[in-house]
């Protein structure tokens, strides 16, 4: 007989650990051991965290095979979404954030659950009414949610995280399913009321979009999973990928990471590979920086740190020169009816806000990516999002006992640490990673500053951003880097960041300054004002986390 239950969780969110183990029936009789059926595995040959791969290539997570876990997830989501659809819609109440529903799935089936060929398991759903609201806010209908996640087998992603998490993607590329640790799931539960308030005020965000939180109890273990938006569509060939924090301490990809098909590079790699940054038009740059500023304020209010900006780059010019083959192109089954795409699910939609887009940008032509250019003028599409907002909670807890030992100077580690992290993150993204393409000069400015050069120039008299007249007499703004003006200047130093103004020079609520604060030609790059503090901060982080 299956058992189903629901109710508010007790203080401390104990239901994350409670419940009948998967190998135990409702009567308390042991049904099997973890060595039976799909929970059996060979000796692991590779193990990262709870994730291991045996000699046959089978992936297991907490002694449950990946195939069994995928099947349990699909059975559980099918049941919970179906049962929720029978309940009338209503406003979200405070107690809805703490409700946990549980259903037991015996392998022989029951009057509530179908028979299956996996071992017995229990499936828990956290805050089902609240997450239903989140899905509706992003335009995800229940039938589309089920169709995306449960109509076809989930696809396991081989490039897992450093924490050993498992990642699955839905067959239509719409959703990502990620395994999370107990503390991360617990923290997400505590975040839900504030997350609800933030989404009501601003659904357009680069923060993760959570669509569901579940737990599979199998083989006596709790496997917690979260369903999120997919930042990186498989249908688009990615040429580079970066995980950026705005820090330089130990922020270089390892040799092992570099050997992967699509390595995830870090801050020092970016400064060496793309020292001039990525250039966006003025409106796009302003929208992106305002979105980052707003999202960082939300994270700061929750005292969240250690998050990253995940950025994948599709080079449109390279893609045109590459041969079309199965290794570089993924195809989505066009015979299937396309489900309703989630609102604000792409990088472009996340930053556009309610403002008019302007005549030069059309999202359908850019596959959801943000158009940009590098210093060579190559056309790029950027796919970005803020990640790892749950992992930081563990680090914050480790630091809580050390607050009194931290320096209270305004520029160094202090009790206002989340604000420091947010400010550094914004500065790095909007001054170093992303740059604004200069606007075409107006006729008045041309008259004042001359026909060919902008007003600001280096010691040699050469402008950083010259505007050369064309044959028709019109001026076209061009992106000219210091490497082009003075080839001897080495911009690839990984330990140097462009000069930025002190914190106090930026008024509260104003957008982060653009790249106009870069040093003029002929002047050596200066170390960021906070670089020494940054090094102390990162050393402190390393010592506290080990």
From Swiss-Prot:
Annotated Basic and acidic residues bias: 473-493
Numbered residues of crosslink Glycyl lysine isopeptide (Lys-Gly) (interchain with G-Cter in ubiquitin): 87
Entry-linked CDD domains: PIPKc_PIP5K1A_like (cd17306)
Domain PIPK, residue spans: 65-433
GO cellular component: cytosol; lamellipodium; mRNA cleavage and polyadenylation specificity factor complex; nuclear speck; nucleus; plasma membrane; ruffle membrane
UniProt catalytic activity: a 1,2-diacyl-sn-glycero-3-phospho-(1D-myo-inositol 4-phosphate) + ATP = a 1,2-diacyl-sn-glycero-3-phospho-(1D-myo-inositol-4,5-bisphosphate) + ADP + H(+); 1-octadecanoyl-2-(5Z,8Z,11Z,14Z)-eicosatetraenoyl-sn-glycero-3-phospho-1D-myo-inositol 4-phosphate + ATP = 1-octadecanoyl-2-(5Z,8Z,11Z,14Z)-eicosatetraenoyl-sn-glycero-3-phospho-1D-myo-inositol 4,5-bisphosphate + ADP + H(+); 1,2-dihexadecanoyl-sn-glycero-3-phospho-(1D-myo-inositol-4-phosphate) + ATP = 1,2-dihexadecanoyl-sn-glycero-3-phospho-(1D-myo-inositol-4,5-bisphosphate) + ADP + H(+); 1-octadecanoyl-2-(9Z)-octadecenoyl-sn-glycero-3-phospho-1D-myo-inositol 4-phosphate + ATP = 1-octadecanoyl-2-(9Z)-octadecenoyl-sn-glycero-3-phospho-1D-myo-inositol 4,5-bisphosphate + ADP + H(+)
Gene Ontology MF: a single term: kinase binding
Bias (Polar residues): 462-471
Annotated segments matching region Disordered: 441-522
InterPro entries reported in the protein's UniProt record: PInositol-4-P-4/5-kinase_C_sf, PInositol-4-P-4/5-kinase_core, PInositol-4-P-5-kinase_N, PInositol-4/5-P-5/4-kinase
GO biological process, alphabetically ordered: actin cytoskeleton organization; cell chemotaxis; fibroblast migration; focal adhesion assembly; phosphatidylinositol biosynthetic process; phosphatidylinositol metabolic process; phosphatidylinositol phosphate biosynthetic process; phospholipid biosynthetic process
Keywords for this protein: ATP-binding, Cell membrane, Cell projection, Cytoplasm, Isopeptide bond, Kinase, Lipid metabolism, Membrane, Nucleotide-binding, Nucleus, Transferase, Ubl conjugation
Bias (Low complexity): 449-461
Keyword check for Ubl conjugation: yes
Subcellular location: Cell membrane; Cytoplasm; Nucleus; Nucleus speckle
EC number of the protein: 2.7.1.68
Top-level EC class: transferase
PANTHER family assigned to the protein according to its UniProt record, in alphabetical order: PHOSPHATIDYLINOSITOL 4-PHOSPHATE 5-KINASE TYPE-1 ALPHA, PHOSPHATIDYLINOSITOL-4-PHOSPHATE 5-KINASE
Protein task: Catalyzes the phosphorylation of phosphatidylinositol 4-phosphate (PtdIns(4)P/PI4P) to form phosphatidylinositol 4,5-bisphosphate (PtdIns(4,5)P2/PIP2), a lipid second messenger that regulates several cellular processes such as signal transduction, vesicle trafficking, actin cytoskeleton dynamics, cell adhesion, and cell motility. PtdIns(4,5)P2 can directly act as a second messenger or can be utilized as a precursor to generate other second messengers: inositol 1,4,5-trisphosphate (IP3), diacylglycerol (DAG) or phosphatidylinositol-3,4,5-trisphosphate (PtdIns(3,4,5)P3/PIP3).
Quaternary structure (record): Interacts with RAC1. Interacts with TUT1. Forms a complex with CDH1/E-cadherin, CTNNB1/beta-catenin and CTNND1 at the plasma membrane upon calcium stimulation. Found in a ternary complex with IRS1 and DGKZ in the absence of insulin stimulation. Interacts with DGKZ. Interacts with PIP4K2C; the interaction inhibits PIP5K1A kinase activity.
The protein, known as: Phosphatidylinositol 4-phosphate 5-kinase type-1 alpha
